[in-house]
Every structure is written in C-alpha cells, then in structure tokens.
Amino acid sequence: MKRILFCCIAAGLFLTGCYYKTDSPRGSWAKGCDLSWLSEMESDGVQFYNDEWRDENGELYPQDCICMLHEFGMNAVRLRVWVNHATGWSNKEDMLYLAKRAAEEGMRIMIDFHYSDFFADPSHQTIPAAWQDYTYEQLCEAVREHTLDVLYALKEEGIKPEWVQIGNETPNGMLWPVGQLVYEDNNANGCWDRYAGFTKIGYEAAKEAFRDINVIVHVDNAYEYRDWFWRAMKEHGGKWDMIGLSHYPMMAAWSGKTWPEMNDLAETNVRQLISEFHCPVMICEVGMLNYGTDSVYQAVEELSNIVMTDFVERMERIDSCMGIFYWEPEVYGGWRPAEYIPLGWGGYDMGSFTPEGQPSKALKTLLRSKKLTANN
C-alpha cells in the first residue's frame, strides 16, 4: 500500500513538473509578439530573413520566424484562439501547433480567447455559430468548457501559459447580444451582470486548469481612462488578475490625437489604473505604421521607431507594467489572410518587418528593451 501511494505521489510530481522551461522568469518584463498569423503565412510561402545571417556566398537564407525573433530578444508569444473558424486557422489545433513551437524556443505564452469564430473587437463580438441558440446559462457553460478544453490541451503538450485573456478587446462586452453592454440603461436589463458573469466563468475555468495563471481582461485604447468600466466590472462580480490594453498611437484617424499625446495619455492611464485598482497592467497589443517602399518606407520606419522608442521607455518606467506585445509584427509585403479577400479588406499595415522580410527598427527596439523585472 505504501509503495502504491509513493508511486502515485511520484507520478503526480512528474505530471506537474514536465512543462517546457522558459528562458525568462515568470513575472519578468515581457517583450512579446502576437504571431497568430504565422502558420497561415508560412503555408502561403512567406519567408523571413535576418541581414546578419547569410550563407557562405553572402546570400540571405530563410529563418524560422520564432527562432529569429527569440535571437533578437523576444521572450513571450501571444496566440489567439477561435472556437471554430471555417478555414481552421487560429482554431485550437493551429494555436497548439504554434504554442508548441514557441515553447520549444523557451517562450512564455499568452492565450487570447476570443469566444467567437472570427475576430472579436469593440465592434464585433459574435457568438460562435455552434452557440447561437444558447441561453445565458448555456453560454456560461460553453465558455467554461471551451476554456478548459483549450487549456487542458496545452497542459497535455507540456505547455504552461503564464497569461490568459478572457475575451479580446471587450469594452462593450462579449458574446453579443447576450453579453453586450448597453451603457444608457445602467444595467437595467442585466447586461453588466451577464458580461461580468462571462469573465468570472472564464476566470474560474482558467484557474481550474492552471492555478497560478494570470487572467487578463482586455480593452482597447490605452489612451482612454475607463475607470468607470473597471468599477462596474467589480461591482457586478467580474474577475481579473491583470488589466490588458491595446495601443496604436499612430492611428490619428481613430483618436484625433497626435502620437505624442496618445503615448502621454497611455502612460498616465496605466499609472492611474495600477494605483486605483491595485493590479498590474499588460500592453497586450501595440502596432506602428509599416508601409511603402524605398524612401517612403524608410521615412515611415524611422518615425515608427521614434514612436516605439518613446512608448517603450514610458512603459519601462512603470514598475507594475508587465510588458508589451506587438500585434502580428511578422506581416509584410501586403500579405493578407485568405478570408480578407471576399470581405474586401486590405492588408494589415502595422506589421513590423521590412519589405525585404526582416525585423524593422521599431520591432528591434521593443525586443531589445532592457527592463529586467516588472514588479506586481
């Protein structure tokens, strides 16, 4: 009996201790990239290069993108997961494929749950097709089951995520219309209760899978101080460990502000959120303009690097800012995912690789940032 008990304990220790090792310690400054499009880009034949790595004839040769960015200083990777996208990209299996590659490179991992079959953002939070007719209670159970299914699949691969997002850019709620926030009615229809309930269910499922995982609730526009949002979340039972923000400071058309104004407001906002809500902040998405060729590209690259340098230095000065993730920096050369074509969407113009397929100055600035610890 004693031998059986010993074997069971030993087996338990093995199962909880066989995760991939990370190159940088938990809680240190995250210099990350969201690389969720990488597998689709590779399938389309896109290649990545590093001017410092050439063959014996002096010719550039293709590099593994994750390995190369790791060499430049990347220590974390963010990956989105959709419930059931028609193409299969960013579904569980695709996310697992990329997560395993990142883990093999010693990366810390963030999983970004959209709880949708396609992009979720402030203007779109579409219930997955398979969940369309669910009641609120059934949606809560679906959120729980989906979260556990994905996280236990990671655990089976020996991957222990450090962070998990319960929803993507959700200032207006999630799983619309059931969890859509209607600010005018001050929760008269229970919308805040339902949205906060979804975050709580996701939070508890994440903690069931990984007890010490950091759970993030993520909103857009780091330059906007939404203290009222976080107060309402608390009031209605929402749960989180860390606040996540997006920041695209060169998009004046969105904000009507200059990039120095947006960076300054973002710094003030991050400091105020940390002070008022006593939790750390993560910049889950950042992006700088990246387009053109020849002299046009060179001018854009220089300006983007100035903006990035300013923003990184501001965030480095804040003890409880835990890091910055660049959103899809690997995109270059006008590439766009297949589903964008029938939608009439253009390519993403805030990637951070040059027209020659090499990391830009702005990306190198982020990945070479020197803050070693982030105190929470």
Placement of each model-derived feature along the sequence:
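C-terminal motif of bacterial Sec signal peptides marking the signal peptidase cleavage site
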Residues: 15-17
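Boundary/entry segment of secreted carbohydrate-active catalytic domains
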Residues: 23-65
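Active-site beta-loop-alpha junctions enriched in small/polar residues
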Residues: 35-38, 82-84, 114-118, 166-171, ...
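Acidic-and-aromatic substrate-binding clefts and catalytic sites of carbohydrate-active enzymes
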Residues: 42, 47-49, 54-60, 83-93, ...
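Aromatic-rich peripheral "rim/lid" segments of glycoside hydrolase catalytic domains that contact
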Residues: 43, 49, 272, 293-310, ...
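Glycoside hydrolase catalytic-domain groove-lining segments
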Residues: 62-66, 212-214, 226-296, 312-316, ...
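Substrate-binding cleft and catalytic face of glycoside hydrolase catalytic domains
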Residues: 66-191, 195-214, 220
